[in-house]
Amino acid sequence: GMAEAMIKHLPESTVRRLGIFAHGEENVKVHRDEPVFDGQFSNRCYREAVKQAFTHFSEKAIAQNRFDPDLDIILTEQWARIIMHLPYAFQAKRMFPDVFRHDRQHLESWKHVESEIGVMPEESDFETIEEWEKAMDGYRRAISKTESFKQFVEDRIEKGQRASSLIGNQYTGSIFLALMSTFEADYEENANLDNVTFGLCGYGSGAKAKVFEAEVQPTWREIASRWNLFERLEGRIAIDRVTYEALHKGLAKESIVTPKGEFA
C-alpha cells in the first residue's frame, strides 16, 4: 500500500523499475528529525568555536606579518569595535572572557587581573573533567565582573548589542544587525571611525566560527545616516499569538501592516 503509493510519485528511474525496496525491507518507516536544544551545550560550542577561530586568526596574522606579538598591541586592543554573531543580545559579553584572557595572559596587565580573581584553574588539579569545567565556568564569570573586562565590553562590544536587545532572540543575519547597530550608535554619538579596524566573528551551523577584520571607510557616516535603524524599530507594531502563528505557518492571507517601500 504505502510503498506503492510512494513509488507512484517517484520519477522514472532504474531504482523505480527494479523496486526501491528490493533490498528486503518490508516496512516503510516515516519519520522526521526534530532538533533538541541544550542551551548550556550550545553556549559551550559557541565559546570554544570563537576561541579556536580567534587563535587561528592570530596564528595566521603572525605568519603573514600582519601582527608581531612581541612588538604590536594585542589584536583585541587594535580593534576599535568587535562585531559578533548575537543569537541573543548579551551572547558576546558572556562568551568573550576566554578570548579576553587568551589575548592578555602574557601581559603585565593580566597579573593585576589575577591578583583580583586568582589564577586560572588547572585541569590537573581536579579529579574529573566535569569538576574542572565547573571551575572554569566560575573563572569566566569572575573575569566578566572585573573592571577591565567591563570597560572592554563598554568600549568595543556594547554598541553592537543595542539593536539585538530591542529585537530579542534571532539567528540569521545577527552579525549584520550588530554591525548596523554599532555604526548607527557611533553615528548618533558623532564618533570618529574613519580608517579604524573592526574585528568580526561569524558563527553558524556545525558550531563553526570565523574571525576576520575590516577597515572602516570614511564614507561610513553617509551610509549609516540612511538606515534610521533605531527609529524603525520604535515603529514596530505588536501582534498577538494567533496572528504570529498564522504568519509563521504561512496561513495569513493579508499583510498585517500596509506595505511601504517593499522590494517585491
List the model feature ranges, each with a label.
Residues 90-92, 205-210:
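Flexible loop/turn segments at secondary-structure boundaries
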Residues 67-98, 126-132:
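Conserved beta-ketoacyl condensing-enzyme motif
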Residues 119-147, 165, 173-179, 183, ...:
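Non-catalytic terminal extensions of PLP-dependent enzymes
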Residues 96-102, 214-218:
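Short secondary-structure boundary/capping segments
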Residues 67, 84, 105-113, 121-158, ...:
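Hard-cation-handling environments
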